[in-house]
Amino acid sequence: MRKRVARKPNEALESVLEEAEQNLLAAFAKSQKTKHRGLKGNARAKSIADFLTARLPAAYGVATGAEVVDYADRRSGEIDIVIFDKQRNPVVSADPLWIAAETLLAYIEVKTKLTVGELNKSFIGAKQINALRPFKRPFTLAGQPDAGATDNEQLRCFRTVFAFGTNLGCKGWLDNEWSRIKKAAVFASVTPASIDRVLVLNRGMLNPPSQTGTDQFAVSSVFQQWVFNLVNFLARENGRRPAWDWQLYAKSKIPGWRAL
């Protein structure tokens, strides 16, 4: 058996992500100085969206304050940040900002402080995503494949709750946060796997589909781990996701054609 060799950290990449994390915290602190709640939320979402826009490949669109709509006019409600393939898929509408469910690859809900109420709202939002029918079929949740579809037909959407803090104390935080995540899922009548990651920037990260979590900052920044998770997911999912067909959203009756 070969002895495993510890991998040398990539200092260049780590320094970029560490700087980005500090910039997010600085943007959060700056937003605290405004008394307008809407402006606070917009500033925090924009700081994350700007980071992703600058570092994701140009093919990806990163938008804030968007709503996702499917062929039957089911809608998600406004989402803080959405990520989609803008190279192959145009937006449905720029004002208001609508994107087709078929183009949605990931979304992020940004929270100032994670509380029971905010978790409840996040899982209700996830339930609205579950109700969408991209390509006339549901999104597949992590760890819960659709038995009636092939691997290439499974449609995934990476869902994140990104919080700058939590109202829970440090002692036993990971277990306590997981406990109320499960309760929030029950509140919304969905499975905890309806959200892929719950990231608390100053505390740790939970992976509800695998029922695991970490608060070990000394090993690696949870922000870095989240970025890696997101980027790897986008590369896998977008590589097999078909392009959106406008015809899916056309009127049920279209003009007939005849030979000339």
Indicate residue ranges for each PLM-predicted region:
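Intrinsically disordered, low-complexity Ser/Thr/Pro/Gly-rich regulatory segments
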Residues: 1-78, 83-260
